């Protein structure tokens, strides 16, 4: 269970007793489980806020819960990646910019657009009562983190925060996490193959797009890239849920 302790401490602000795993890569198996827990809390916040009959307020509560539960670290990674990828001219300058704790213009604009778009999509999900899709987005976002950590090299030669997860990870970690995530996803979707397949396809698309982009820009992944991939995947899965509802 040390892997679970490491996963919870890495992905959330929640204090948990116990010792962490000696190999951080062993925590990757638990990422979808932690994603399920986070998703349930965020969806629960949205459900309670929807009792007011105000979808916009409920969408804000979902986002606020997500930021508070994760220290906003994935959003921070998204901002850092936006600054580095669009502000740097070469691999080294991009990595240097991403390591800078300050937020630049690309990062600020990216965050504004990210949360604006998330809010719009969440309003629709909440109005339709699609709470399983909210949870699924958070769940699959953590699966994509495992996919990138397991299949791509670490970009920084000097190491970094996520190096322990990436350098010790292999395809077996992804396969195990994938099976766990798929089982949970099917439960959330009441065993229905169409919504499960669409949600999973959106997550796969997010993983592929992020992989192609980060390999082109910096030749691998960093902690910021893993965080950004989580944010990007949440959006894709939530959007796919809205489109499925509109087409039904």
Swiss-Prot record:
One annotated Gene Ontology cellular component of this protein: plasma membrane
Keyword hit for Signal: no
The protein's required cofactors: Mg(2+)
Catalytic activity: alpha-ribazole + adenosylcob(III)inamide-GDP = adenosylcob(III)alamin + GMP + H(+); alpha-ribazole 5'-phosphate + adenosylcob(III)inamide-GDP = adenosylcob(III)alamin 5'-phosphate + GMP + H(+)
EC number: 2.7.8.26
Pathway note: Cofactor biosynthesis; adenosylcobalamin biosynthesis; adenosylcobalamin from cob(II)yrinate a,c-diamide: step 7/7
Membrane topology term: Multi-pass membrane protein
TM annotation in the entry: 28-48, 103-123, 126-146, 169-189, 193-213, 225-245
GO biological process entries: cobalamin biosynthetic process
Pfam families per record: CobS
One Gene Ontology term of the molecular function aspect: adenosylcobinamide-GDP ribazoletransferase activity
Primary location: membrane
Subcellular location: Cell inner membrane
Keywords: Cell inner membrane, Cell membrane, Cobalamin biosynthesis, Magnesium, Membrane, Transferase, Transmembrane, Transmembrane helix
Family (UniProt): Belongs to the CobS family.
Function of the molecule: Joins adenosylcobinamide-GDP and alpha-ribazole to generate adenosylcobalamin (Ado-cobalamin). Also synthesizes adenosylcobalamin 5'-phosphate from adenosylcobinamide-GDP and alpha-ribazole 5'-phosphate.
Protein name in UniProt: Adenosylcobinamide-GDP ribazoletransferase
Organism this protein belongs to: Chlorobium phaeobacteroides (strain BS1)
Classification of source organism: Bacteria, Pseudomonadati, Chlorobiota, Chlorobiia, Chlorobiales
Encoding gene, per UniProt annotation: cobS
């Amino acid at each position: 269970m040390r892997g679970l302790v490491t996963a919870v401490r890495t992905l959330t602000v929640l204090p948990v007793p116990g010792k962490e795993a000696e190999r951080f890569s062993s925590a990757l198996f638990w990422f979808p489980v932690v994603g399920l827990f986070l998703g349930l809390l965020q969806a629960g916040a949205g459900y309670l806020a929807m009792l007011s009959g105000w979808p916009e307020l409920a969408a804000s509560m979902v986002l606020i819960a997500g930021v508070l539960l994760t220290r906003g670290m994935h959003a921070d990674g998204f901002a850092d990646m936006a600054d580095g990828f669009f502000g740097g001219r070469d691999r080294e300058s991009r990595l240097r910019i991403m390591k800078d704790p300050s937020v630049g213009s690309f990062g600020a604009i990216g965050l504004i657009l990210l949360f604006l778009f998330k809010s719009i999509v969440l309003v629709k999900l909440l109005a339709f009562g699609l709470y399983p899709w909210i949870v699924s987005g958070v769940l699959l976002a953590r699966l994509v983190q495992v996919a990138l950590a397991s299949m791509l090299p670490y970009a920084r030669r000097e190491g970094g925060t996520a190096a322990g997860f990436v350098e010790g990870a292999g395809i077996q970690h992804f396969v195990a996490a994938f099976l766990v995530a798929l089982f949970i996803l099917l439960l959330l979707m009441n065993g229905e193959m169409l919504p499960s397949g669409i949600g999973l396809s959106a997550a796969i698309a997010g993983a592929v797009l992020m992989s192609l982009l980060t390999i082109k820009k910096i030749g691998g992944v960093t902690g910021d890239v893993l965080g950004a991939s989580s944010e990007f995947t949440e959006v894709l899965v939530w959007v796919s849920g809205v489109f499925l509802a509109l087409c039904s």
